[in-house]
């Protein structure tokens, strides 16, 4: 969905976030040198209007988590310095094009849904997180046994390695490698995908991905105490005695700068997984 922020006559505060690779540092250096002398821009990692991520999708995920509490004020734009990145609109040789587009920017943005996660521990503490791609729960040393509850109704008893819940944009990441479907981000939904489920005459699960609409909630209730590995995008945590994990579509969204160079979702999918098609 395209919307617009009001930037009329406003100096844009820009944060530049780059990984440690040589080419990323070169791109960052060029952007710094241009913006520091431009009266229409102010370089600051504090309260930015625009966050420029330089690297790949992993770098953009890190940038998202750096500013996940300011999503209503921030727009992101990605520059890829390696192979094509799913969230990036510019390659490293297109820096001049990015600078020109930002100078002409009127505040237009493309918005994608994100995932909200609430993890309840046996002592009553609740750990909350946001994910741009997905959140997974696994039990490494033993089979994970958990009830899957949708809108307070028990759907199935799961046995296997774990569960992944992804956003529409995250549907092209780990979810796809698990055999999940690719969802267009205008479909505000969550996707639950099983990780190596056990299915036989005794234990049964649906065995396919489930698409959950925005108004619905997913709950995962582990049936055994122990240590669980929980991944939120590119961050992994070891949590002991998890009693419940809840998943929702967040009220906030991630916003990307919309410009003539913004690549449509299906173009990104094609470039990432199919490439050029012979006519």
Swiss-Prot record:
NAD(+) binds at residues 57-58, 133-134, 159, 161, 172-177. It catalyses: NAD(+) + ATP = ADP + NADP(+) + H(+). Gene3D superfamilies: Probable inorganic polyphosphate/atp-NAD kinase, domain 1, Probable inorganic polyphosphate/atp-NAD kinase, domain 2. It comes from the Bacteria. SUPFAM superfamilies: NAD kinase/diacylglycerol kinase-like. It comes from Streptococcus pyogenes serotype M4 (strain MGAS10750). GO terms for biological process: NAD metabolic process; NADP biosynthetic process. It is found in: Cytoplasm. GO terms for cellular component: cytoplasm. This is NAD kinase. Belongs to the NAD kinase family. Involved in the regulation of the intracellular balance of NAD and NADP, and is a key enzyme in the biosynthesis of NADP. Catalyzes specifically the phosphorylation on 2'-hydroxyl of the adenosine moiety of NAD to yield NADP. Pfam families: NAD_kinase, NAD_kinase_C. Its main location: cytoplasm. Its cofactor is a divalent metal cation.
């Amino acid at each position: 969905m395209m919307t617009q922020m009001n930037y009329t006559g406003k100096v844009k505060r820009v944060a530049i976030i780059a990984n440690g690779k040589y080419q990323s540092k070169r791109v960052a250096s060029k952007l710094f040198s241009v913006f520091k002398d431009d009266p229409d821009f102010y370089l600051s990692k504090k309260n930015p209007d625009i966050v420029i991520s330089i690297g790949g999708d992993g770098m953009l995920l890190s940038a998202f988590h750096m500013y996940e509490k300011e999503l209503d004020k921030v727009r992101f734009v990605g520059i890829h310095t390696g192979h094509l990145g799913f969230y990036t609109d510019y390659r490293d040789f297109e820096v001049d094009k990015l600078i020109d587009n930002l100078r002409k920017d009127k505040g237009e943005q493309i918005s994608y849904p994100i995932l909200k996660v609430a993890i309840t521990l046996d002592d009553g503490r609740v750990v909350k997180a946001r994910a741009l791609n997905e959140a997974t729960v696994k039990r490494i040393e033993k089979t994970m046994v958990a009830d899957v509850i949708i809108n307070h109704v028990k759907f199935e008893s799961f046995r296997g390695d774990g569960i992944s819940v992804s956003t529409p944009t995250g549907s092209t990441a780990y979810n796809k490698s698990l055999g999940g479907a690719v969802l267009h981000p205008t479909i505000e939904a969550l996707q639950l995908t099983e990780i190596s489920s056990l299915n036989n005459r005794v234990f049964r699960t649906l065995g396919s991905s489930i698409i959950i609409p925005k108004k619905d909630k997913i709950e995962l209730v582990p049936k055994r105490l122990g240590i669980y590995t929980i991944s939120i995008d590119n961050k992994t945590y070891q949590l002991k005695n998890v009693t419940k994990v809840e998943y929702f579509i967040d009220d906030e969204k991630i916003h990307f700068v919309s410009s003539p160079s913004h690549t449509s979702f299906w173009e990104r999918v094609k470039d990432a997984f199919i490439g050029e098609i012979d006519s």
